[in-house]
Amino acid sequence: MSDINTESGESTSLPNSTDPPLSDVNIDVEDDDTAESISSLQPIVSNTTNPPEEPINPVLGQYHQACQKGDLATVKQLLDSGVLDLNTDLTGDITGLHWASINNRLSVVKYLISQGIDVNAKAGDLEATPLHWAARYGYVHIVDCLLNKGADPTMCDMQGFNLLHLAVNSSNVMLVAYVLFFVVAKGIIDIDCQDPKGRTPLLWAAYQGDSLSVMLLLKFGASTKIVDEGGFTPLHWATVKGQPYVLTHLIRDGADFFLKTNDGKDCFTIAQEMNTSHSFKDALSICGFNQDGYPKRKLFKKSDHAKVITFFVPLVALSIIFILFTHLHPLFALLISLIFGLAVNKALKELILPSYSNYGLHSTSLLKSPFLSGTFFGSLLLLTIVWIFKIAPFTIFKSRLLTNFFMFLILMQIYYLFIKLIFSDPGCVPIETDHENVRGTIKELLDTGKFDIKNFCLETWIRKPLRSHFSTLNTHNVARFDHFCPWIYNDIGLKNHKNFMWFILLTEVGIWFFISLTMKYFDILEDTNEDVACFLLGDDELCAGFVYDRFTFLIALWALIQSVWVGFLIVVQVFQTFTGVTNKEFNKYVKEKKNQHAFDPIFFNDTFNTTPEELRNDDDDTAASRTGNNPNHSNGTTIPSEGSRINTRKPRTCFNLCFAITGLDQVRTIVRETLGIGGANEMSRMQLLSSIPTNYGWKRNLADFWLTSDVMAPIWRRLFYSPVESRALLNGVEVDYFKLYDFPEKTYPEPTGPESV
């Protein structure tokens, strides 16, 4: 059964289609605010253990039980034999169609409708139709079938709830999406329809903390201004719940947080009383307001101007820090640099970042800004200046002409790739805006039993291609998404992944060319100056560089440090291209492997899939088992609130943050999961690699990644050029990654000898 709780962190949950059928219940809800709030989420409540006053007909009992269990053969036998008449199918006004609908028995529903049963029959004290019963539990396929067979979506139960109200109360966002596109978009139901208490679907979604439904309702133009009989707007009820994403959606849409209820309470007062002030103030900050609800002061009218400043700040900061270490004692330079760094960080957060246009659900951070890409650019520019004005003049005629020439070529290529990657299209899948096309997509997914958020994108209204991921930076699904790279301030995907590989390879090679030339330069300094000795560096060329050109020494040291994490990044990327997997996919497979045998008393159906058993296939069951969404469990269909997620997530330390930025966390995962260092056994490692559906063998994987699908082009062009459109190789076959819904099958040759990876 479903439940609702106003405490932050709780979420509604719905039974899976494989739950035991509901029977021996009585629909009886008291007419008060609490009962009304709960009744739509608990449509069928056993309030009494008293048996019916008159004995149940054994034939009707057998028939209803068959409808509940989905026993189509028994239903057909009873109706075909004539022992049961659909017109007398009553047990307390509850028909077999009601029982089949609320238990997600699609085949029984279709058969009963084909036999002429009344699809709008009312049942129970609430006088609810089968459509209402199915909607309360979020069963999209049943709702679709009933609507196609004449069920009236405008009918209300005794509580005044219509199809849209009940869809929202089910907390199944896929049903909400279906009703919005197939009913609301056609003008059959008003998006702002109110129940007898004046509560709109948006108000109910806000009260439940259902951020996905709130997002969809707002996309369809739901009003944030309408108040219920108590003077509460959706934002007031969202403040009661305290779900930060819901608050952010509503405030960004223009909800008035100063508006007072009939009791004279605004959102600030409600947040304080309900202990949700932290979530409310965070939402205000994300939407550009201070803690008092007034717009933050912005230094820049355009977000792009603030981003340009953020990009160039690291260049200035690095220059100052290197100058400090060049002319001051290292301890004093370190102290001043720390103070200076904290001041820069504070200035950026307080003065620059508020000018960003934030369309996401989280506050803008330096990690999600051009700051790190500016750090790379500043480092590269300082290295270039040192090479041009200090190193090249001394080494170009000292048997290092060819090395300097290659250094020039590498630097030019790095600059070119860096700029190209920043402005590149990672492979954004076009957004769908035509409602008719969206309805066609939904119908297709319903027919295949794949109408869930794993296959349908709620943000862009498209069928999600395999290997794609929605990017908040680009606000599109990115085909063959790998990861977001803060060093180029862009996503890495199908269209720019190969350029990214060339970029990091050339960066690593360029650093070592620079180190080689720097050592030659220091050797010249040692020969042309007095001999000196250093405490840790000895008396060779390193000491000469430190004493006679400390700025160049520091730049070389900084470059050497960067080469370490770039090298690890190359290892990760090469490993993943060998195994035919992206960064995001590998992390997902590792997580699934860890959770495969974990027991959790609460299983969340985070894909919102309510496909009836009749439409499921073996692949669906296998996938559900791998992801923890086993249909044999009573899964909820509401994603836990952000508050509950944060409470169960380990806090990220500074050490872990540095690991994530430099990619060392990926190296650690690869070493542990594939080399067996850290606990993974041989069988576990082989299971992980074999579970990757895009791993077709290392030779095939490399060819798929490095060669374009244009087989008529020269081999050099296929190697160095990235995919221009959405087509690329997968298992040697050209596929359209914008419409990739099935993987090419793996072929397993007959073993004739020792198998190779």
UniProtKB/Swiss-Prot annotation:
Kindly give the Pfam families that the UniProt entry links to this protein. Ank_2, Ank_4, DHHC
Q: What chemistry does it catalyse, as a reaction equation?
A: L-cysteinyl-[protein] + hexadecanoyl-CoA = S-hexadecanoyl-L-cysteinyl-[protein] + CoA
Listed InterPro entries:
Ankyrin_rpt, Ankyrin_rpt-contain_sf, Palmitoyltrfase_DHHC
List where the protein spans the membrane. Answer: 308-328, 332-352, 376-396, 403-423, 499-519, 551-571
* Residue spans, topological domain Lumenal: 329-331, 397-402, 520-550
- Give the EC class as a word: transferase
Q: Name one GO biological process term.
A: regulation of endocytosis
Q: What EC number(s) does this enzyme carry?
A: 2.3.1.225
Q: Which residues lie on this side of the membrane: Cytoplasmic?
A: 1-307, 353-375, 424-498, 572-757
- What spans are recorded as compositionally biased (Polar residues)? 1-20, 36-46, 624-646
For the region Disordered, what residue ranges are annotated? Answer: 1-54, 614-647
Of the GO CC terms on this record, one is:
early endosome membrane
Superkingdom classification of source: Eukaryota
What's this protein's function? Palmitoyltransferase specific for casein kinase 1.
Free-text note regarding domains: The DHHC domain is required for palmitoyltransferase activity.
Which family does the similarity line name?
A: Belongs to the DHHC palmitoyltransferase family. AKR/ZDHHC17 subfamily.
Q: What is this protein called?
A: Palmitoyltransferase AKR1
User: What organism is this sequence from?
Assistant: Naumovozyma castellii (Yeast)
- Taxonomic lineage of the native organism: Eukaryota, Fungi, Dikarya, Ascomycota, Saccharomycotina
